[in-house]
Amino acid sequence: MGMPNFGDMMKQIQQAGEKMQDVQKQLEKLVTSGEAGGGMVKVTVNGKQRVLSLWIDPEIMDDAEMVQDLVLAAVNSALEASGRMAQEEISKVAGGMINPQDILKNLGQ
């Protein structure tokens, strides 16, 4: 077997970098949500796991502990959905060239 062509390898690395940038842009546009307490708390996040909105039913505002618990549950639900959505999008766009976990680890950068 012959040695790999260095030029081809560099081209593949460049293509992977371009795809990663495209994926990052796509993830910002993807939106999902989570809720808790039967819809008393709703959170919307994007594919980069940034919270875009938080809604709390005014009727539950008197119970601070319940509000805290529901906010945490809704945020975690939305982030889990966002993570699944991001992995699907990365896999779809990258076509096996990029490991979804590599991008997800660097979302905050």
From Swiss-Prot:
GO MF annotations, alphabetized: DNA binding
Main location: cytoplasm
Lineage summary: Bacteria, Pseudomonadati, Chlorobiota, Chlorobiia, Chlorobiales
This protein's record includes keyword Transcription: no
NCBIfam families per record: DNA_YbaB_EbfC
Domain of life where this protein originates: Bacteria
Keywords, sorted A to Z: Cytoplasm, DNA-binding
Extent of the signal sequence: none
Cited function: Binds to DNA and alters its conformation. May be involved in regulation of gene expression, nucleoid organization and DNA protection.
Subcellular location: Cytoplasm, Nucleoid
Subunit structure: Homodimer.
Cystine crosslinks: none
Protein family: Belongs to the YbaB/EbfC family.
Protein name, as recorded: Nucleoid-associated protein Plut_1285
Cellular component annotations (GO), alphabetically ordered: bacterial nucleoid; cytosol
